[in-house]
Every structure is written in structure tokens, then in C-alpha cells.
Amino acid sequence: REGGMAGSYLYQDPEAKYDYIADVFDTLIVRDIRQKYKIRNPILMNRIVDFLMDNISNLTSARNIADALTGNKDKINHKTVGNYMQYLCNAFAFYRVRRYDIQGKKYLASSDKLYLSDHTFRYAKLGTKNLDYGRVLENIVAIELLRRGYEVYVGVLYKKEIDFVAIKRNEKLYIQVSDNISDEKTFEREVNPLLQIKDAYPKLVLARIRDEAYQYEGVQIIDIADWLAEQPSTSQK
């Protein structure tokens, strides 16, 4: 919930801290977008922001958002939604991650994921509404991979999703992210798609295991806090 906003650490009171963070987002990002692109429907912009924050780590598209936000009276144009989404990405409020067909080695055009640049923006704006720690952790890992210089994609293999395919020059990582893998079914759900990948690049499951890293049939199981704290090169061993 703390995020990476340096100025927020000046505030001891949690409510004051999150008010500050929300104000930073509204002032430096949303207001700047409104002025730069001469937004004619600021209410729609705010609704799109809230929708994207509420659906971090979910596949989405401009058309899906337009359909979800369209009420009984007003029809929302998906092209307008797409423009607003692009403006938010241009302002680095969100990062767009495309889907990649691992077997076919091609990019997929339909539905991307948009990750929030700092997950604490979501908490400051929406509180604990629909809070899913698995999706929050996935968002954190996406931003960290980008920070480490990887090109990041959502992997698709035999209609199953690999959370991340991370590529940097001749390096490649396949990563699954989960809040808790103590349940056997959850563990299998996260590991099995990785086991179906036939190449020799590293395959990781990042989860809150609170234990030493270990391997399962060649898949590295790593505590997500340890992975975030380590030097980037160590994740490739």
C-alpha cells in the first residue's frame, strides 16, 4: 500500500498520505492530460481511470470498457475510450502490455493488459474496493520487469495464459505470479502452463511462499519479496 511516491513518506497519518497520493495523480496526470489533449469529457476520463484501476492485471479493450461504462441513456464510443487509454499510457499513468503467442511466436491483436505505474494510486483512489492481492502482485511484478529493462508481454500457450514473457536482448523469462500457492490446485494451475513450454529459458513462479526458493521440475519457485529485493541478474540463474 505504500508504493513508490517519495513525498508520501512525509505524512504519518494514513488518510493524509493517501489524500496526497490521490492529489498527485489527479493534478500531475489527469489534469495534465485534460489540458494537453483538450479532453471534452472529463467525467468519462475519470470513469475510465477508475475502471482501469479496478481491473488492473485483467485483459481489457477499448470496446469492452465502452460497453461496461455505457448506461441506459448515453452510448460511449469505443474509439474515444481508446484515445483516452492511449493518453493515459502516454502520461505513464498506465503501461500497456500486449499478448504474445508462445507457440506461434506472434503478437495477438485483441485485448491487452494495462498495468498501473504505481499500485498505491489504486489504493488511494479506490481504497479496498474489489482488492485482489494476486492482481496487485501481478501489477507490481509487471512494473518491476519494465524497470529492469525487459520488454514485457502476456504469454498465451494452448489457450492458457502465462502471466509474463520478459525479453531483454538474448534473455527470456517466463513468469507466473500468485498470491498463495499453498493449495495444491492453485500450485498446479500456476506451474502446469510453464511445464508445457519446451524451450530452456528460465521459468519462475513468484508467490508469497515466505520460505527459501526451490525448484519443481525445473521451475523456480521464489518468494516474491525476495525476487523484488534481489539484484536483477540473480533471477536469471
Language-model segment annotations:
Residues R1-M5:
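Amphipathic alpha-helical segments of the small helical/lid subdomains adjacent to P-loop NTPase cores
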Residues Y9-K172:
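Accessory nucleic acid-recognition modules appended to NTPase machines
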Residues Y115, L173-I175, L204-L206, Q220-I222:
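Hydrophobic/aromatic beta-strand patches that form the interior of the parallel beta-sheet core
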Residues L145, D163, I175, L194, ...:
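Hydrophobic, well-ordered secondary-structure elements that form the walls
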Residues L157, K198-G218:
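Nucleic-acid nuclease catalytic cores
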Residues I162, D183-T186, E212-Y216:
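Short active-site-adjacent structural elements
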Residues K172-S182, E190:
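Active-site ExK catalytic segment of metal-dependent nucleases
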Residues I209-K237:
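Domain-level recognition of nuclease-like catalytic cores that cleave nucleotide substrates
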